[in-house]
C-alpha cells in the first residue's frame, strides 16, 4: 500500500476498504486528504471501484452514515448530480466531493485510453527476442496480525500503557524488542503513526554519564538528540525524550520481517 503526498487527479488511485486497512488509513493519513478509488457516472448510478465492482456501502452501513461528512457551506451535497468521487478525510470519515467539471474527468480518461492503445501498438511493432521466463516463487514472511510492515521490519503499537520494563518483556514474548529505528524513514513513520501518544522505544542507558544503547546493547548513533537526563527513551511530540522507567506509557515493538526473493530468470528461446 502506498500513500502519496503529491496532489494528483483521481485516476488510478485505489483503496481496499477492509476494516483493518481502513483503521490503518484513518490513523496514518493525518491532516491530508487522499483520493481513493470510488467513482460514479452520476448521482443516479451506484458507486463503483476502479475495477468496476460495486461498492457495498460498508461504512454507511456500519457507521450509521457518520462517515459521510456534512458538506460545508457552498459545497455540493451527497445525492446531487455533480458528486462523483469519495476521498478519505481526517478523523476517519469519507466525504463525497464535486470535481470542477465532469468533462475534465472524461477527457482525462480518453487521453489515457489513447495512450494505452499507442503503447500496446508500439510494443507489438518493435522487434523483440522471444524469451521464456522460468519463474521461481517469491516467498514472503508477512508481518503478524496487528503488526505493520515498513521496509524490512514489522512494528506493533500497544493499545494500553505500562512501564518500560514490562513493555520490553511484552515485546520479547512476541520474539521482538522495544522499537528500534535505523534511518529517518522508520523514525518518521513511528512519529507519525504513534499519533499524540508518548511511546516507549528500545533506547536506554545506565545513567546520564553513559551512552544510549538499544536493547541488543548496540550503541545509539545519536541520529536524533535525546532530551532529558533520565535512563529510558520514548517518542514524544518534541522528538525523543527521556524518562524514568516506571512511568506508564504505550509502547512500540519491532522485529525484522525476513523474506526471500527470487527473481525470474529469462531464458532465450
Curated annotation (Swiss-Prot):
What this protein is called in its record is C-type lectin domain family 2 member G
Q: Report if keyword Plastid is assigned.
A: no
Membrane topology, Extracellular segments: 129-269
Question: Domain C-type lectin spans what residues?
Answer: 150-254
Which GO cellular component terms, listed alphabetically, does the Swiss-Prot or TrEMBL entry include?
extracellular space; plasma membrane
GO MF annotation: an example: natural killer cell lectin-like receptor binding
Show the InterPro entries listed in the entry.
C-type_lectin-like (IPR001304), C-type_lectin-like/link_sf (IPR016186), C-type_lectin/matrix_domain (IPR050828), CTDL_fold (IPR016187), NKR-like_CTLD (IPR033992)
What are the annotated glycosylation sites? Answer: 163
Regions crossing the membrane: 108-128
Amino acid at each position: 500500500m502506498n500513500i502519496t503526498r503529491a496532489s494528483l487527479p483521481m485516476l488510478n488511485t485505489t483503496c481496499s476498504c477492509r476494516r483493518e486497512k481502513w483503521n490503518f488509513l484513518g490513523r496514518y493519513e493525518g491532516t491530508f486528504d487522499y483520493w481513493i478509488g470510488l467513482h460514479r457516472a452520476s448521482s443516479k448510478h451506484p458507486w463503483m471501484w476502479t475495477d468496476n465492482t460495486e461498492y457495498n456501502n460498508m461504512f454507511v452501513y456500519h457507521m450509521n452514515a457518520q462517515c459521510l461528512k456534512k458538506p460545508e457551506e457552498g459545497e455540493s451535497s451527497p445525492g446531487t448530480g455533480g458528486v462523483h468521487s469519495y476521498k478519505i478525510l481526517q478523523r476517519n470519515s469519507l466525504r463525497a466531493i464535486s470535481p470542477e467539471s465532469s468533462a475534465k474527468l472524461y477527457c482525462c480518461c480518453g487521453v489515457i485510453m489513447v495512450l494505452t492503445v499507442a503503447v500496446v501498438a508500439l510494443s507489438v511493432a518493435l522487434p523483440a527476442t522471444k524469451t521464456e521466463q522460468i519463474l521461481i516463487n517469491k516467498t514472503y514472511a508477512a508481518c503478524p496480525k496487528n503488526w505493520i510492515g515498513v521496509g524490512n521490519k514489522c512494528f506493533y503499537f500497544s493499545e494500553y500503557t505500562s512501564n518500560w520494563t514490562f513493555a520490553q518483556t511484552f515485546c520479547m514474548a512476541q520474539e521482538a524488542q522495544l522499537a528500534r529505528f535505523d534511518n529517518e524513514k522508520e523514525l518518521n513513520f513511528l512519529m507519525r503513526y504513534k499519533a499524540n501518544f508518548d511511546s516507549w522505544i528500545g533506547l536506554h542507558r545506565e545513567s546520564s554519564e553513559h551512552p544510549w544503547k538499544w536493547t541488543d546493547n548496540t550503541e545509539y548513533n545519536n541520529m536524533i538528540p535525546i532530551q532529558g537526563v533520565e535512563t529510558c527513551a520514548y517518542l514524544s511530540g518534541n522528538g525523543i525524550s527521556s524518562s524514568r522507567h516506571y512511568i506508564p506509557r504505550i509502547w512500540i515493538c519491532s522485529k525484522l520481517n525476513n523474506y526471500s526473493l527470487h527473481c525470474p530468470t529469462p531464458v532465450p528461446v
